[in-house]
Amino acid sequence: MAGGCALKVLVAPLDWGLGHATRCVPVVREFLNQGAEVELAVVRSNAALLRNIFPELRQRLAPSYNIVYPKHGYNMGLWLVKNGAHLRTVMNYEHSFAEEVVDRYHYDVLVSDNRFGFYSRNAKSIYMTHQRRIAFPRVLSAFEPVGMLWHASVMKRFDEVWVPDVPDLPGYAGTLSHVKKCPVPIKYVGALSRFEGEKLTEKSDVRYRFVAVVSGVEPARARFEELLRKTLVKIPGRHAVILGKPSLGVKSSNEQNLDLFTHLPDEQFAAVVKNAEWVVSRGGYSTVMDMAVLGARCVFVPTPGQYEQIILGRDLAHEGYAVTIDESKLSTETLLAAISEKARVALPKPEDDNNLLKDAVYATIHSRISSH
C-alpha cells in the first residue's frame, strides 16, 4: 500500500471442493465494501465459479492440492498420513508462490482459507478455518492429538486465525470450531455464506419436493450424483439435481421426473432451494452455512472418509437442526422414512448483519494503515 492507495488483499481458497471458495465470497465482499482492493488466487476447479460472482476481480493461478478422496469410509485420516510428503511439497510450493506474489504485486494482506502454506513474512497473513479440531473416527482416535498439534503448527505461521462460526457453543460447527487454546490471535467471524446479505429476488416457477445438491471432488462427486438420481427418480413428485459443475456453464436437461442443472448462478440456486420442501446434499460446513441462510430443511449425506462431515451431521441431527443419512444407507425407502420422522427440523438462521466479519475486516484494514 503506497502513496495513499487502497489496501491490497489477496484471497486464496483451498481447492478441496467448492465450499472453501463459496465461503470466501462474503469475506471478499466485506473487504471491497470497506474500500480495499481485492484479487483472487484461484485454481482451475474454482476459477469459473469465482469469475461468475466477481467478474471484475483479477485472478492469479495458484498451486493446486490435487486431492482425490478415498473411495471407502474412515480412510481420510490415514490418507493424510500416507500422503504427508505430497502435502508438504504443495505447502512449500504455495509458500514460495505467496512470497513471490507479495514481493511482485505488493499485497498488504493474504487471506488463506485452509491453505496451509499460504502466508508471507511481508504481508499480514490470515488463516481461515472452522476445523480447529481435526477429528478422527473412534478407531483412529489416537491420532487426534497429533492432528491438533500439526494444525496448531500450521496456524502459528499466520498472524491471525479467523473462524467462520459464532463464538458460543454449539454454533454451527460445534466442538470442531470451539477449542480453548489457539497459538495465535483468533477471531470468530460469524457464519459465512455467499448468499449472506444478498437481495435474492428471483423466484422459482417450480415447487420441488426434493432438491439434490451435488458437490465435492471426484470420484466422490460422480458417485453421489448417480446415487441421488437412482434414489429420487423413484419418489413421486418433481425433483431438481444441481450437479456442481460450474466449469460446464449453466445448462439444463430433463430425465423422467428430474430437472438436471450443471450449475446455477446464485440467484437461481437460492430460488430453487428456497422453493423446495427438502434439500439433500453433502454435509460440508460451507453447505451447512449456505442452507442456514436460505432457511432450507436439509438431509445431509456425509462424504465417506470425511469424518468432519460425519461429526457435523451427527451434531446437527442431535440438536434437531437437520437429518443425516450415511451414503451406504441412502435409498428411496430410507430417505422417505427419515423425513417422515423429522418433519420439523430447521437450521438456525444467522443474523442478517454479520458484525463479527465487519469488525474483523475493519481491524485488519486499520491496523495495516496505521503500520504504514
Where are these regions (language model features)?
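Conserved nucleotide-sugar phosphate-binding/catalytic loop shared by glycosyltransferases and other
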Residues: 6, 15, 33-85, 259-260
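Active-site-proximal region of nucleotide-activated glycan assembly enzymes
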Residues: 57, 121-188
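Conserved nucleotide-sugar donor-binding subdomain of glycosyltransferases
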Residues: 75-117
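A donor-sugar binding/catalytic signature common to diverse glycosyltransferases
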Residues: 268-311
